[in-house]
Amino acid sequence: MPITCFIRYQIDPFQREAFKRYAQAWGEIIPRCGGRLLGYFLPHEGSNDVAWGLIGFDDMAAYERYRARLRSDEQGRANFERAQAERFILREERSWLEDVFAAPR
């Protein structure tokens, strides 16, 4: 069963560009590790401290394989470490969604 990991970030609105660089780095890392990056999103209007990331997987087993690869990915570890050091992510929540309908690719 296809699933999507929906990540909601509370970000420091004064470090928007730092989060943008963080999100852009995942554009290479996630596919290399086996995830299907659906996108990262920053606020355009409205609340300025919330961002989102969506990553698709064929099933939970595919997600577990992705996690194992990600742990050994040098660029992935560096991206996590940079986020911790620079503190532009204040909070992160993950929800797992069952894909009911997805737009054609």
Task: State the predicted function of each range.
Residues 3-8, 19, 30, 51-57:
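Short, structured motif recognition centered on aromatic/hydrophobic residues
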Residues 10-12, 56-58, 97:
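Solvent-exposed residues in well-ordered beta-strands and their adjoining turns
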Residues 11-21:
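Short, surface-exposed ligand-recognition loops at beta-strand->loop->(often short) alpha-helix junctions
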Residues 15-17, 61-63, 102:
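Residue-level signal for secondary-structure boundary sites
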Residues 21-38, 56-94:
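An amphipathic, aromatic/His-enriched active-site/gating alpha helix that lines ligand/cofactor pockets
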Residues 40-44:
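Short, solvent-exposed loop/turn elements at beta->coil junctions and helix N-caps
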Residues 46-49:
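Short acidic/glycine-enriched loop/turn segments that link adjacent beta-strands
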Residues 89-92, 96-105:
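Acidic/histidine-enriched, glycine/proline-rich intrinsically disordered or flexible terminal extensions
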